[in-house]
């Protein structure tokens, strides 16, 4: 598996980071408390004395969930910032990355914090009693910082009514709007608040849970920003802090998880961001769409890319796609060709997805027992969803968010073509846009003995499908990395996938799955050529099920190391290139996964 690659335009003066002309100081105007804070205008209340962070003298404590194998340095201070953080909040791959990568970095000896909104009254997060007042638009907003220490990571939650009062009950899609595809009108204010609060957290939170570190993180920090919601952080870092001699060597890495969501707003809204005018050019953007307004706009992701010191994304092939042209770079391809972009394949949570211990399976298994156990799990799955129980009938699973990116409409259009020629069963699982939910149910009504559609969130069924299905269909129009195919391989289920993004980097034709070719990125139409690709490839794969070649594919899938260990090392190598003062290589460590879910959110 290709784990790390760099895509870069071969032109004079272009490097992976951002050239010095984009690294500009600025001004800031938040409410001052004392002369020291006046430079920031940030008011902090209730924080205990915050000495410089130090490494604790004893390394023998077993309070953290990692084992040190050999030490090679003192590591880095890493602060990940994102709108999602699994399992507390998640709508897709962004939440999974911020849930899984930080513990792997901590296991390698780095001090790691993740900052995300407090969308719910999480049972395991405690009020630090630290309060800050932050200027957003024309008003000062008071935020509190909640904290828990899990799997070697400081999890920090920003508490404010803009987050907590909008998201009642289970978070799901309500992080960004009341319904799938609908945004809250104040998302700019919400995520401006997140960015500014995240910059305060390492300086003012006196955290002492880690057996190896104590006190605040200090100012020698690498901020790892994720997607458009954090696009302002580098701007605020330069204008509010570095121009005043604070965070002098701190750097920002900006990771793109999905280029299709960019944070485009009216150009007039720039004035509400409280940034110097010299940042305007980084936000300035014109496209051919009339939403949210026609004509000139600001683009948060564009600014995040230009103002960052390093730009990354979640797979090497997706990095190549992003700079290939407007269609797949979503009109930011020219910007990324300027800055350069590095792709690192994601890992997955191998403790949550483990066929040897999975409590949802009828029969647990490993690579030595997979073939018989998968047949038994198939029979249990067929019975569970109401399909005829027959282990000899090939079973195809489709699991995904029901939105254009995942191509549920393409999959649905291909089903009649598949069933005309093949004796096969298909189970469809997903929630999302109502039009796609109706499409799924229509297939079940049309083919009652062959198709089952489950249009609700059902985690146990997802696990059962991974174990019981013969093939996993992934019909994404684009897929930055993809998690579903990693989960499938973990359970010995070959993937039949579109040839895009991380699917290219992780699925090997004839070894761990089947490639159907690249599908059109036009989300407004279902191309007949794409339907043919899906149907033809699935029919080809179905014919392989049950053969010695298929049995070999099952084994090939299960021998893969899909954990975060390898990606974490690649991330370390890239972040060390930033040269933040005091940063050193970490240690060679191994995280010990918790035996049970530690972090349970209140419903």
Curated annotation (Swiss-Prot):
Changing residue 9 to F: In strain: cv. Shikoku Hadaka 84. One of its GO terms (biological process) is starch biosynthetic process. Changing residue 70 to R: In strain: cv. Iyatoma Mochi, cv. Morex, cv. Mochimugi-D, cv. Shikoku Hadaka 84, cv. Waxy Oderbrucker and cv. SB 85750. Keywords: Amyloplast, Chloroplast, Glycosyltransferase, Plastid, Starch biosynthesis, Transferase, Transit peptide. Pathway: Glycan biosynthesis; starch biosynthesis. ADP-alpha-D-glucose binds at residue 90. Changing residue 34 to K: In strain: cv. Iyatoma Mochi, cv. Mochimugi-D, cv. Shikoku Hadaka 84, cv. Waxy Oderbrucker and cv. SB 85750. It catalyses: an NDP-alpha-D-glucose + [(1->4)-alpha-D-glucosyl](n) = [(1->4)-alpha-D-glucosyl](n+1) + a ribonucleoside 5'-diphosphate + H(+). Its EC number is 2.4.1.242. GO terms for cellular component: amyloplast; chloroplast. It is found in: Plastid, Chloroplast; Plastid, Amyloplast. It comes from the Eukaryota. The keyword Coiled coil does not apply. Residues 1-70 form a transit peptide. Its main location: plastid. Changing residue 45 to V: In strain: cv. Iyatoma Mochi, cv. Mochimugi-D, cv. Shikoku Hadaka 84, cv. Waxy Oderbrucker and cv. SB 85750. One of its GO terms (molecular function) is alpha-1,4-glucan glucosyltransferase (UDP-glucose donor) activity. Belongs to the glycosyltransferase 1 family. Bacterial/plant glycogen synthase subfamily. Required for the synthesis of amylose in endosperm. NCBIfam families: glgA. This is Granule-bound starch synthase 1, chloroplastic/amyloplastic. It comes from Hordeum vulgare (Barley).
């Amino acid at each position: 598996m290709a784990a790390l690659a760099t895509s870069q335009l071969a032109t004079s003066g272009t490097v992976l980071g951002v050239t010095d002309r984009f690294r500009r100081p600025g001004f800031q105007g938040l409410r001052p408390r004392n002369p020291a804070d006046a430079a920031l205008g940030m008011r902090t209340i209730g924080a205990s004395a915050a000495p410089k962070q130090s490494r604790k003298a004893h390394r023998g404590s077993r309070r953290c969930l990692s084992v040190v194998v050999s030490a090679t340095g003192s590591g880095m201070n890493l602060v990940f910032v994102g709108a999602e953080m699994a399992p507390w909040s998640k709508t897709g791959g962004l939440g999974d990355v911020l849930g899984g990568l930080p513990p792997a970095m901590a296991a390698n000896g780095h001090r790691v914090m993740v900052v995300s909104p407090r969308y719910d009254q999480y049972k395991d997060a405690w009020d630090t009693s630290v309060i800050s007042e932050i200027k957003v638009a024309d008003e000062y907003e008071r935020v509190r910082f909640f904290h828990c220490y899990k799997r070697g990571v400081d999890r920090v939650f920003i508490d404010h009514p803009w987050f907590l009062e909008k998201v009642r009950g289970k978070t799901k899609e309500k992080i960004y709007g009341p319904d799938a595809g609908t945004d809250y009108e104040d998302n700019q204010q919400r995520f401006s608040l997140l960015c500014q609060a995240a910059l305060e957290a390492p300086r003012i939170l006196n955290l002492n849970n880690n057996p190896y570190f104590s006190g605040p993180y200090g100012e020698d920090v690498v901020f790892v920003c994720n997607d458009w919601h954090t696009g302002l952080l580098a701007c605020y870092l330069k204008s509010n802090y570095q121009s005043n001699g604070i965070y002098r060597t701190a750097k920002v890495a900006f990771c793109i998880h999905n280029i299709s969501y960019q944070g485009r707003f009216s150009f007039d809204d720039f004035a509400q961001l409280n940034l110097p005018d010299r940042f305007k050019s980084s936000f300035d953007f014109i496209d051919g769409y009339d939403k949210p307004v026609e004509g000139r706009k600001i683009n948060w992701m564009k600014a995040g890319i230009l103002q960052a010191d390093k730009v990354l994304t979640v797979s090497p092939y997706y990095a190549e796609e992003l700079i290939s042209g407007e269609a797949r770079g979503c009109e930011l391809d020219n910007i990324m060709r300027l800055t350069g972009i590095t792709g690192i394949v994601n890992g997955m949570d191998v403790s949550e997805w483990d066929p040897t211990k999975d409590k949802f399976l009828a029969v647990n298994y490993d690579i030595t027992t997979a073939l018989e156990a998968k047949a038994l799990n198939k029979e249990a799955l067929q019975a569970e969803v109401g399909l005829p129980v027959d282990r000899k009938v090939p079973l195809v699973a489709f699991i995904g968010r029901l939105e254009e990116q995942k191509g549920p409409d393409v999959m649905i259009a291909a089903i009649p073509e598949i069933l005309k020629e093949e004796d096969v069963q298909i189970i469809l699982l997903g929630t999302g846009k109502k039009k796609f939910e109706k499409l799924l149910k229509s297939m079940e009504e049309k083919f009652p003995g062959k198709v089952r559609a489950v249009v609700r969130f059902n985690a146990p069924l997802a696990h059962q499908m991974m174990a019981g299905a013969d093939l996993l269909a992934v019909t994404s129009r684009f897929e930055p990395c993809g998690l579903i195919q990693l989960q499938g391989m973990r359970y010995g289920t070959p993937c039949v996938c579109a040839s895009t993004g991380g699917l290219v980097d992780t699925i090997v034709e004839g070894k761990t799955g089947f490639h159907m070719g690249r599908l059109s990125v036009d989300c407004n139409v279902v191309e007949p050529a794409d339907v043919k690709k899906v149907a033809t490839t699935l029919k080809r794969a179905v014919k392989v099920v049950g053969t010695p070649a298929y049995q070999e594919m099952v084994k090939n899938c299960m021998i893969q190391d899909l954990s975060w260990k390898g990606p974490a090392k690649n991330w370390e190598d890239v972040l060390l290139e930033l040269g933040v003062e005091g940063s050193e290589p970490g240690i060679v460590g191994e995280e010990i996964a918790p035996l049970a879910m530690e972090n349970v959110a209140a419903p």
